[in-house]
C-alpha cells in the first residue's frame, strides 16, 4: 500500500535581527512536496549572503512550538532521530530525511543563527 505523506515546507523566510538591517533572505525549495513513507527527502535552503555554517533547521507541527533538529548546519540536536541530517555552508544548505516517517509531516524551515544552542 502506497502511503503518501505530504511534507509542507515554508517557502520564503525574511530574517530580522534587532539592531541590524533586514537584508538577508533565505529561500527554501521545494515550497511543498508529497512523498511516501520510507522515501529520502531533501530540502534546500539558499541564503542571499554567506553565513558560514550559522544555520539551524527546525520542524514545526500545527499548534506546537518549533523543534530544533539541526544546529550549525550539520549538528544533530540531542534526541532527534538519526534519519535527519544537515549539510552545507556559506550560501547553500540541505536538510535530509533519509527515510520519511508518518510523524515527519510538518513544516520545515531554516533559520540563520549566530551561535550553537
Curated annotation (Swiss-Prot):
Instruction: List the InterPro entries.
Output: Ig-like_dom, Ig-like_dom_sf, Ig-like_fold, Ig_V-set, IgV_Light_Chain
For this protein, the record's SMART domains field holds: IGv
| Ig-like domain span | 24-117
Record key words, sorted: Adaptive immunity, Cell membrane, Immunity, Immunoglobulin, Immunoglobulin domain, Membrane, Secreted, Signal
Q: Which GO terms describe its cellular component?
A: extracellular region; immunoglobulin complex; plasma membrane
Asked if the keyword Signal belongs to this entry, the reply reads yes
Q: Which Pfam families match?
A: V-set (PF07686)
| Location in or out of the cell | Secreted; Cell membrane
Claim: Ubl conjugation is one of the keywords in the record = no
Give me any GO biological process, just one: immune response
Q: Where is the signal peptide?
A: 1-22
Q: How does it assemble?
A: Most probably, the immunoglobulin is not assembled due to incorrect folding of light chain. Immunoglobulins are composed of two identical heavy chains and two identical light chains; disulfide-linked.
Q: What functional role does this protein have?
A: Probable non-functional open reading frame (ORF) of V region of the variable domain of immunoglobulin light chains. Non-functional ORF generally cannot participate in the synthesis of a productive immunoglobulin chain due to altered V-(D)-J or switch recombination and/or splicing site (at mRNA level) and/or conserved amino acid change (protein level). Immunoglobulins, also known as antibodies, are membrane-bound or secreted glycoproteins produced by B lymphocytes.
Report the protein name in the record: Probable non-functional immunoglobulinn kappa variable 1-37
Q: Gene of origin?
A: IGKV1-37
